[in-house]
Amino acid sequence: MERDLAQAFINLIKSIRETRGLTKEHLADLAGVHRTTIGLLEKGERYPTLQLSNQLAGALQLPLSELVKEAESIVKGITTPEELALIHNNRTPKIEHIRNANKLLNLTGLEPKMLLGAIESCYNTLDSIDEQLAGKGGVPLAHLVELANLSSMVGNMIGGGIAECSDGLYIRNRPHAYPDLLPQKAPAVDLELKMALETNKPKGHLPKAGTYITFRYVLGDKFGNFNRGKDNRGDTVWIWEVKVGQITEDDFSCSNTEGDSGKTAVIKTDIFNEMALVYYNEDHLPYTKRKVGGYVGYN
């Protein structure tokens, strides 16, 4: 690495380390290097080789290519190490947001780490797209497409993430086929995925019985700040709720207005509220929070 880029890389690694609460010694142990190495780097007394850079990226569970791109943005003055470290921290779904893990496992065969991995995979894809758009002077994806199309795209990314992170339990079905995720081995099941914005109810074109996993998201800023209301929507997708449940055809409310090409089957409110809440980020709650019991779908 050239010197300016190397120094930016070191500063970024340091900021991420501090944001995660890691000591120099702990990071060194995770990277498999001598305990004095991190101190020498941060003091500017040593610059990282390609091998060492790769070890540090691996220790932080981040792609080296991504860290190098971010170091380049620091050199250009586009952002700071502290901002990037905060984004990395907030874009990593937290285990404390998992609820009813036993129901997630019993209904879908998925473990919490698989769900968290799928969400993080989606975030990484979205952020990569936004970085490329920004590099060409464009606007973020959330401002480039209609919200209905954004929901569809995010749903596809989440579906791909589940398949990727499921340790072989699931593969994606072909486009526009039911169910979205096909089981490959026990305890996986036919799994339909639905996506909705904010407080909207997940819906499809036809009522279909089966096992459902639903995701709802909000639009905040890149640091995770979120304010309720359409006028306050940001440009960064944040998953705030995931639910799972067994749904029958009678659990849908259907609309079929003559001449209306947009036939819809929406999961009934009481049924949806009773579905097991398996991921919940209160910081991004689009409802008015109750004094007791979170929100109407909390369980």
Where are these regions (language model features)?
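Short amphipathic recognition helices of helix-turn-helix/homeodomain-type DNA-binding modules
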Residues: 66-83
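Alpha-helical residues within the helix-turn-helix
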Residues: 18, 29, 58
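Nucleic-acid endonuclease domains
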Residues: 82-179, 195-299
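Short alpha-helical DNA-recognition segment
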Residues: 21-40
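Conserved catalytic cores of phosphodiester-cleaving nucleases, focusing on short active-site segments
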Residues: 181, 187-195
